[in-house]
From Swiss-Prot:
Homodimer. Mg(2+) 2 binds at residue 418. It is found in: Cytoplasm. Binds 3 Mg(2+) ions per subunit. GO terms for biological process: lysyl-tRNA aminoacylation. It holds the Pfam family tRNA-synt_2. InterPro entries: Aa-tRNA-synt_II, aa-tRNA-synth_II, aa-tRNA-synth_II/BPL/LPL, Lys-tRNA-ligase_II, Lys-tRNA-ligase_II_bac/euk, Lys-tRNA-ligase_II_N, Lys-tRNA-synth_II_C, NA-bd_OB-fold. GO terms for cellular component: cytosol. This is Lysine--tRNA ligase. It catalyses: tRNA(Lys) + L-lysine + ATP = L-lysyl-tRNA(Lys) + AMP + diphosphate. Its cofactor is Mg(2+). It comes from the Bacteria.
Length: 498
């Protein structure tokens, strides 16, 4: 153990060694370098809100005592007085420390403090000659000694990967990043508030599943030792939530982590946060209204506006979202009319003619979807509901009563990316079994995103699922949109890293 400790010390740079020497010196003086609780009367925002509008003379007359605490981010001064800025969650507050006010011992503590140390200060609110609200210290208390120096205050963390791996440093040194994560929390709170206010019940469903289902995705597999059985981390929330509609809960939602064993890029992380909501006695058109309401409300409440900018592109979340059938969208962009009945050979010929990559296992429905993804998706900059997906790519959606080739399903696209997926739920257990069996055949042919028959779910449907509208929204992508973040890693506190 002593050898390991010695090796660790040898790895430290000069600044770190000096800080450790200061820590030991504090201990020798009977001062705990890692402090204890401290009672604050104000955070920085409250202090500025209450006192910014007062003059220097008014504050001197008021002689108000406050207690503040935070991480020391700047320090200047020499001789018998100095200034510093303490940073808390809301921002920064300046402190003014004089030797003749705090005493020799406390002033020495301040004088030898390093940036990054935590302090608690009690004193009077004043204003400097430059008009900055400041706490003139009567007492100053070391709360935590930082043993490592912070990133350079002018350059911050320039290494993007380090920002993701050491998010705590990113939060300390990058206000934009800190504010984004505060907004993320507010966005999720507003989504909850909106759904709760509309009569939805928040529930929690299992993360470990016997059968992966509810989405076309490759799952993570784990093993339960006591039961000696493989289990899957959930790839969607859907199938358990629909069981609750069968059980009579009528309006339910869950915001939770979902796991997919797939690639990582600017919009995909192996674990991410989903909102799924299910409403009895509704259909996919009602769910369009719900989706619009959730997103518009989050923008209004958190940003104060529905006119936002993403990557330089203006996006209008306040106007009614456009609604367009997938086949019409493909026809607009390519001239190809998939409303016409056609054989698989004819569809393959069209794909070849338009350089659309397909596989032998694809049906006409799959090919329509490939046309959409190739030619249409990137063009959808303003909020657009694309509805009428083919049955082949929608195993859990109800068939359209007028045209059984398509489903009552929609996806919401903004800035060329998918933000929501929803449909009138398939509530016919016979049809559901057939679709599961089709999926099982696809899996046997090598499609590792297709899944088998979920007997327990079918049994639940046989007890009766009322007509139901279901919705899934990727929370991380929505936060990206509302905070103008270019990568999903910028909205995940601790993204998956190699």
């Amino acid at each position: 153990m002593a050898e390991e400790q010695q090796a660790h010390l040898e790895d430290l740079n000069d600044q770190m060694l000096v800080r450790r020497e200061k820590m030991e010196a504090l201990r020798e003086e009977g001062i705990d370098p890692f402090g204890k609780r401290f009672d604050r009367t104000h955070n920085s925002a409250e202090l500025h809100e209450q006192y910014d509008n007062h003059t220097k003379e008014e504050l001197s007359e008021m002689n108000t005592e406050v207690s503040v605490a935070g991480r020391m981010m700047t320090k200047r001064g020499k001789g018998k007085a100095g200034f510093a800025h303490l940073q808390d969650r809301e921002g920064q507050i300046q402190i003014y420390v004089r030797k003749d006010q705090v005493g020799d011992e406390a002033y020495e503590l301040f004088k030898h403090a390093d940036l990054g140390d935590f302090f608690g200060v009690t004193g009077q609110v004043m204003k400097t000659n430059t008009g900055e609200v400041t706490v003139k210290a009567q007492t100053i208390t070391l709360l935590t000694k930082a043993l490592r120096p912070l990133p350079d205050k002018y350059h911050g963390l320039t290494n993007v990967e380090q920002r993701y791996r050491q998010r705590y440093l990113d939060l300390i040194s990058n206000k934009e990043s800190f504010d984004r994560f505060m907004k993320r929390s507010q966005i999720i709170s507003e989504i909850r508030r909106y759904l709760d206010g509309n009569g939805y019940v928040e529930v929690e469903t299992p993360v470990l599943h016997n059968e992966a289902g509810g989405a076309a995705a490759r799952p993570f597999i784990t093993h339960h030792n006591a039961l000696d059985m493989d289990l899957y981390l959930r790839i969607a929330l859907e199938l358990h939530l629909k069981r609750l509609i069968v059980g009579g809960m009528e309006k339910v939602y869950e915001i939770g982590r979902v796991f997919r064993n797939e690639g990582i890029d600017t919009t995909h992380n192996p674990e991410f946060t989903m909102l799924e909501a299910y409403t009895a006695y509704t259909d996919y058109q009602d769910v369009m209204d719900l989706t619009e309401g959730i997103i518009r409300n989050a923008a209004e409440k958190v940003l104060g506006t529905t006119d936002i900018t993403y990557d330089g592109q203006a996006v209008d979340l306040g106007s009614p979202f456009k609604r367009l059938h997938m086949v019409d969208a493909v026809k607009e962009q390519t001239g190809v009319d998939f409303w016409q009945e056609m054989t698989i050979e004819e569809a393959r010929a069209l794909a070849k003619e338009h350089n659309v990559e397909i596989t032998d296992a694809m049906t006409v429905g799959h090919i329509i979807n490939e046309f959409f993804e190739t030619f249409v998706e990137d063009t959808l900059q303003q909020p657009t509901f694309i509805y009428g997906h083919p049955v082949a790519v929608s195993p859990l959606a109800k068939k359209n009563p007028e045209d059984g080739r398509f489903t009552d399903r929609f996806e919401l696209f903004i800035i060329g990316k998918e933000f929501a997926n929803a449909f009138t739920e398939l509530n016919d257990p016979i049809d559901q079994r057939e679709r599961f069996e089709e999926q099982e055949k696809e899996r046997e042919q090598g499609n590792d995103e297709a899944h088998g028959v979920d007997e327990d779910f079918i049994e639940a449907l046989e007890y009766g699922l009322p007509p139901t509208g279901g919705l899934g929204i990727g929370i991380d992508r929505l936060v990206m949109l509302l905070t103008d973040a270019q990568s999903i890693r910028d909205v995940l506190l601790f993204p998956t890293m190699r």
